[in-house]
Amino acid sequence: FKKRRPGVIVGRIIAGHGDTVAVRRGWLPAGAPILPDDPVFGDLAPAVLEDVLAGGRARLIGTGDRLTFIEPVLPLPRLIIAGAGHIGKAVARLASRLDFSVTVIDDRPEFANIRNVPEADEIILGEIGESVRRVEESPDNYFVIVTRGHQKDAEALRAAIGRDAAYVGMIGSKTKVELVHCEFLEAGWATAEEWDRVHAPIGVDIGSKSVEEIAVSIAAELVEVRAKRREPARP
């Protein structure tokens, strides 16, 4: 779980002789093989465990002399905020209350610290583009790029664009976004298809002006994207 892997926790109560019972429990990461002689998982159908994970709901199964409780463990989606300035701080504050695991990246010690962003689950002090590049790959990553300038934004975007992520968004006016768009395509840093997946200008258009309003618009877009990803696929 510390490695952000989804999986299931299984608890089993098995009737023995007389009034005795055996209690067994264990953790199984998603995709891990099940050995036939495993005392906890051995006789469980992999499809049952996969269904619990896919549905995100616990299941209680009673069969014969045993009772089995299967609980999914789904790590929170990871929000990576490039930039710990006023907007980055405000987004971190909101996202921490919206069931995101928040990582904040900045190259300035006076910003990349727990006093500045106390709501962050992880703070990375380092060169912004390289730090974004080193973020572990996951389809549940959400990248929000709100650094202090055009160059830093572009560096962070180069590291995030084209990755298997749920969301990549960059702050900026329509003029700035168009300049970055042209720069990326002309330099070969992104394909047109990759650029089309970038949310820029970032956030839901609510006419936001203040830092807090901008943060609300960004948080709303994050929640919207996450909700759409959770919708069951239509046949």
List each language-model region with its residue ranges.
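Segments forming oxygen-rich coordination pockets for charged ligands
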Residues: 1-107, 111-124, 138-142, 183, ...
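Short beta-strand segments
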Residues: 11-15, 145-147, 171, 199-201
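Alpha-helical elements of the RecA-like P-loop NTPase motor core of helicases
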Residues: 89, 154, 178
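A short acidic, amphipathic alpha-helical/loop segment
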Residues: 94, 155-160
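ADP-ribose/adenylate-binding Rossmann-like module
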Residues: 105, 142, 147-150, 158-184
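Conserved SAM/SAH-binding loop
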Residues: 126-131, 151
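Short amphipathic alpha-helix with an adjacent loop that forms part of the alpha/beta core around
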Residues: 129-139
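Adenosine-phosphate binding glycine-rich loop
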Residues: 166, 170-235
